[in-house]
Amino acid sequence: MGLSGRDLQTYHLYHRSLRCYADNFLRFAETGVTLLAGTDLVFADSPFAAVSEELRCMVDLGLSPLRAIAAATGNCARVLGMQGEIGTLAAGAQADLLVVDGDAAAEIGALEQVRAVYQAGRSLPLPLV
């Protein structure tokens, strides 16, 4: 069954917008601007529902896995004026922790292989939905 009418218009707008976002993202990344990952969505039906998917998209566009991870952690802390307080694993810092099966700094897909989650020092039961 195909799309028609408004659904088809939304589909085309969504894909044109994604191409534009990808081009702009690469331009920003190349200039060295501070990149941030977030959960704000332009389209309600966006496939980027999870931050891990957004980070994978950043890597697919050419960012290193480590720089993509920084966009969701330390960069956010710095922009909020909270560097050293959040967004890092360091003595005295508040930390939520995601334990994954693999090395996400080498392969961003490891972020989807969640082994444990800690929030404010407490282990959360899995699976998280």
Residue ranges and their predicted role:
Residues 2-11, 17-100:
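His/Asp/Glu-enriched, well-ordered alpha-helical/loop segment
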Residues 72-74, 78, 91-129:
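C-terminal cap of metal-dependent C-N hydrolases
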